[in-house]
Amino acid sequence: MKAVRAALRLRPLTNSISTSVYLHRFYSAQPQHTDDEHHPKPEELLHQSDAVFDSSHFDLDLNNLAASGAETTTWDERYRDRVKSRVFDEDDTSSYSKILKRDEEKKYKSAALAKSLLEAALDDEEVEVGEVKEEDQKSLSVGIIGAPNAGKSALTNYIVGTKVSAVSRKTNTTTHEVLGVLTKRDTQICFFDTPGLMLKKSGIPYNDIKVRNESGWSSITLYDVLIVIFDVHRHLTRPDSRVVRLIERVGSVSSTSQKRVLCMNKVDLVTKKNDLVKVAKEFKDLPGYERHFMVSGLKGYGLKDLAQYLTEQAVKRPWDEDPFAMSEEVMKNISLEVVREKLLDYVHQEIPYGIEHRLMGWKELRDGSLRIEQHFITPKMSQRKILVGKKGSKIGTIGIEANEELRSIFKRNVHLILMVKVK
């Protein structure tokens, strides 16, 4: 009888879970099941696996928080690192240095933003957009083109003020033309952020990224102003003759109506300012370019002068976009770009450009929130495993951060669903 009693006491312990069920549900993409639930069929596994991220699993009860008297919520990045370490068994030995670096970047960006806001407030010409008669409207189309990872997306995003194209440390993160719109007083400037272009040493475009190259080269003559941008820091540290050849080729394309501008980007990374003078002299007499600007697309240096120049080039022409509304098409595109940016940040050396990224569902719910469903389609199962991560940690992290950013951009609740499939 003693043996039977001992067995009965031990039996409940065999089904215990080492990780807290609450934490596992709150931070992992894997839905939880009880013993009473049925075993899923094979076709159901797609929706009940680590390969699915559903932001509703991560929502807090805002009503209860308000009732408890919580006035503000402060998020400490260290909490996320601790959770990753405890729940996903990730190494956090370098977390402290990462936090310091992240905090430093945030402080710098906050200071730069505050400075820009102050300058805008002191600028008498800077006024809210009101009703402008069609006959008084001015517009300008601007194409931004350059070598891969030259900073085209960061420049567009900073000037426009809304994330319109994926910004990441990886090369070729822009896969198609994206429209950004800046409306100031009676002038509207439409920016087209083109895919990264690169030439072989022979001067011929690469064929391995055919779609990106064809889209970029075919769009060169379509705009009123063409901005050719290159990474001046890389040009000084790791010179690439292909970049110079690209700049020369664009400048040699004949056009009577289009104005071309050469932007030396990422000047904030150059410590010796005399080096910038040398680069400026190198490209000073290059034919085909009307103006030269030294800028930082990430931190905003020189962009006020660039924006002023573009405003002066605007012509009498009705606006193409409504300055007061963000169209659904733009919102869909932003949702894809934000998720893609997070994907490129967390999937480092592993084939991000072979992954198909599709918007599968978009619905505005009665309460004003958005339900967004996106799918990642990988060529191989091994690539799917990389993207999903251990216990869904990678796709979960991508989903959490993308959902936070989309809520901030759209100023409403967002229900984001990410699913990883194999082609």
From Swiss-Prot:
Stretches for region G2: 172-176
Keywords from the UniProt entry: GTP-binding, Nucleotide-binding, RNA-binding
Chain residue ranges for the region called G3: 193-196
The Era-type G domain, residue ranges: 138-316
Protein's UniProt keywords contain GTP-binding: yes
Gene Ontology BP annotations: ribosomal small subunit assembly
Molecular function as annotated in GO: GTP binding; ribosomal small subunit binding; rRNA binding
Coiled-coil residue windows: none
InterPro entries attached to this UniProt entry: G_ERA_dom (IPR030388), GTP-bd (IPR006073), GTPase_Era-like (IPR005662), KH_dom-like_a/b (IPR015946), KH_dom_type_2 (IPR004044), KH_sf_prok-type (IPR009019), P-loop_NTPase (IPR027417), Small_GTP-bd (IPR005225)
UniProt domain KH type-2: residue ranges: 347-423
Residue segments, region G1: 146-153
Annotated GTP binding sites: 146-153, 193-197, 265-268
Database matches in PROSITE patterns: G_ERA, KH_TYPE_2
Keyword Amino-acid biosynthesis carried by entry: no
Region of interest: G5: 295-297
Annotated spans, G4: 265-268
Pfam families: KH_2, MMR_HSR1
Stated role: Has a crucial role in plant growth and development, possibly by influencing mitochondrial division.
Family named by the database record: Belongs to the TRAFAC class TrmE-Era-EngA-EngB-Septin-like GTPase superfamily. Era GTPase family.
Record protein name field: GTP-binding protein ERG
Annotated source species: Antirrhinum majus (Garden snapdragon)
Gene from which this protein is expressed: ERG
